[in-house]
Amino acid sequence: MQPPTATYCTPEGDSHAFTVVPDAPRYRTTDGTTSGPSAYVLQAGQIDRDRPSPPKLDAQGEPTALSRLRMHLTGLQDDINSFLTAEMQRAKNKKQKIDDTQEQRATGGSTAA
């Protein structure tokens, strides 16, 4: 079975492809880094009752086909979440820069200290 892939497409027509690297550690676990309760919530005493079960292993000690798929999808979800978080931060920074430029123009080029 081929590993899953994903493609993110913007309304403007740009796209970003996500592919699984099966031997990379992030694709060999069901415990994602961008899902579940935040570190802040866990430090406040929250118990993670929804933590995913570990992958099931076959008689040879290898993950079953469905467990491999779960692990690959967990890593893919982490990749997508990280990418979208970075995109949102870029958009926020771009908007802030535009707002700052507009404010400078409105005040005749001076900035508030």
Curated annotation (Swiss-Prot):
Keywords from the UniProt entry: Activator, Chromosome, Nucleus, Telomere, Transcription, Transcription regulation, tRNA processing
GO MF assignments: chromatin DNA binding
Family matches, as InterPro entries: EKC/KEOPS_Gon7
Region feature Disordered, mapped onto this chain: 88-113
UniProt KW Coiled coil keyword: no
One example of a Gene Ontology biological process annotation: tRNA processing
Subcellular location: Nucleus; Chromosome, Telomere
GO CC, alphabetical: chromatin; chromosome, telomeric region; EKC/KEOPS complex; nucleus
Composition bias type Polar residues, residue spans: 104-113
Primary location group: nucleus
Function: Component of the EKC/KEOPS complex that is required for the formation of a threonylcarbamoyl group on adenosine at position 37 (t(6)A37) in tRNAs that read codons beginning with adenine. The complex is probably involved in the transfer of the threonylcarbamoyl moiety of threonylcarbamoyl-AMP (TC-AMP) to the N6 group of A37. GON7 likely plays a supporting role to the catalytic subunit KAE1 in the complex. The EKC/KEOPS complex also promotes both telomere uncapping and telomere elongation. The complex is required for efficient recruitment of transcriptional coactivators.
Family the entry assigns: Belongs to the GON7 family.
Self-association state and partner proteins as the record states: Component of the EKC/KEOPS complex composed of at least BUD32, CGI121, GON7, KAE1 and PCC1; the whole complex dimerizes.
Protein name: EKC/KEOPS complex subunit GON7
